[in-house]
Amino acid sequence: SSLDQNELTGIGSGEPLARISQCNAGLIKRDLRRQGKAAEKLRALSSEQLLDICKRAGDLFLHAELPLNGDGDSQTADQYISTLSQTSGLPHVLVRRNMQKIFTVFDGMHGILNGLMRGMDAGVVETGFGEHSGIPVHYSPTTNALGVVLPSNSPGVNSIWMPAIALGVPVVLKPGREEPWTPLRIMQAFIAAGCPAEAFSF
C-alpha cells in the first residue's frame, strides 16, 4: 500500500468504507515503461479469444464474487451495488441499471467492434492486414496503452474504454475519487475470464 491514501466514507453516515492507495508519478512512469510487454501479452490472444473473454467477463461482472484487492478480500455483486451507492450517492436502482449497460457492452462486444471497424473482419486486429469492400486495409495500434480518467458520478461511462481490451490495447485507469468500484470490478471480471492481468494498470 502507498503512503498517500484516500479514505472513502459513506455519504450519509460518514462511516469509513475503504482506504485507497494513490499512485505517485514514479509508479506511473514505471508502469508506462512496461506497457509494451503488456500489449504483447494481450495481443498474443486471437480476436476470437478476446471476444470469448468479453462474453465470460460480462456474466462474471453481473453475478460473480470477484477479488477486491491483493489481500484476498472479495466483493459480491450485491456488495458492489451497496458500496457504490454509499460512496457515490447513486440509488441502488441506478447502479443496477448501469451494471446492465456495462453487461450489454461485454455481451455485445462483437457488434460494437463491427461498428467501430465499419464492418471489417475483427481478425484484422491480430494479423494487421485485411480487406474491406475489395480494398486492402492495414490495422496498426498507435499506442501501447489507452489512458482513461474516469468520473465518480456515472458507472456506465466505464463502458467506453472496454472495447480497447477487445482491440488488444491495454488500459491505464485513473478512477474517480469516490468511484473506484466499477472500473475495478470490470477489470477483475476481465482477468477472471482469462484476460492477462498485465493489460490493466489501476
Residue ranges and their predicted role:
Residues 118-202:
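Rossmann-like NAD(P) dinucleotide-binding subdomain of oxidoreductase/dehydrogenase enzymes
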